[in-house]
């Protein structure tokens, strides 16, 4: 007589298990749906940060499941597939951290660890503030605006400032490059003629180098002329 225990669930047991945990499954799927659908930096920073945490957790979870699959493979083919997938997950996770750390060294912003993008926008205001924001790619043009004394860029709230605080150059950093944008146009004033209430700026991509933002911040006042 075999001492092995059959741990396979039949259909009825699966149905009973689903009935017992269906409320938890519903709540979990609803949570993921809300996070993935509404998790944008332009909508809600809180939900967006939750989305980043969920995405961060996926890689370790994938690696853990892959290791378990390697320990308990269904057959030889399954073992080979599990090893390949686990190695790929580990390399991808390590690659993410390498690129994020390189980007952090370049721009000194926690947005560097954003798993959705490998680029960070940065505006060094003339009043000493550094405003960093998430950006999905490196655009040809950036158009920050000031509305009611608040600076926005790419739809994200950055800081309270005045039109005179915007510098001549702003930056978009990637792990291996610093993209420099030069101000080419500036529009100030609303319909009432209030120049401090509303302003639009147009920055065009000027050049690319391998410098860091720290070298710009300590390089003198030429940045703001």
Swiss-Prot record:
Transmembrane recorded as keyword: yes
Lineage: superkingdom: Viruses
Virion surface side: 1-20, 73-77
Alphabetically ordered keywords of this record: Glycoprotein, Host Golgi apparatus, Host membrane, Membrane, Transmembrane, Transmembrane helix, Viral envelope protein, Viral matrix protein, Virion
Disulfide bonds listed in the record: none
Stretches assigned to the Intravirion side: 42-51, 99-225
Transmembrane stretches, start-end: 21-41, 52-72, 78-98
Chief location category: virion
Subcellular location: Virion membrane; Host Golgi apparatus membrane
InterPro entries attached to this UniProt entry: GAMMA_CORONA_M (IPR042550), M_CoV (IPR002574)
Membrane topology: Multi-pass membrane protein
PROSITE patterns: COV_M
GO cellular component: host cell Golgi membrane; membrane; viral envelope; virion membrane
Gene Ontology molecular functions: structural constituent of virion
Family classification: Belongs to the gammacoronaviruses M protein family.
Summary of subunit composition and partner proteins: Homomultimer. Interacts with envelope E protein in the budding compartment of the host cell, which is located between endoplasmic reticulum and the Golgi complex. Forms a complex with HE and S proteins. Interacts with nucleocapsid N protein. This interaction probably participates in RNA packaging into the virus.
Physiological role: Component of the viral envelope that plays a central role in virus morphogenesis and assembly via its interactions with other viral proteins.
Name of the protein this chain belongs to: Membrane protein
UniProt organism field: Avian infectious bronchitis virus (strain M41)
Lineage, top ranks: Viruses, Riboviria, Orthornavirae, Pisuviricota, Pisoniviricetes
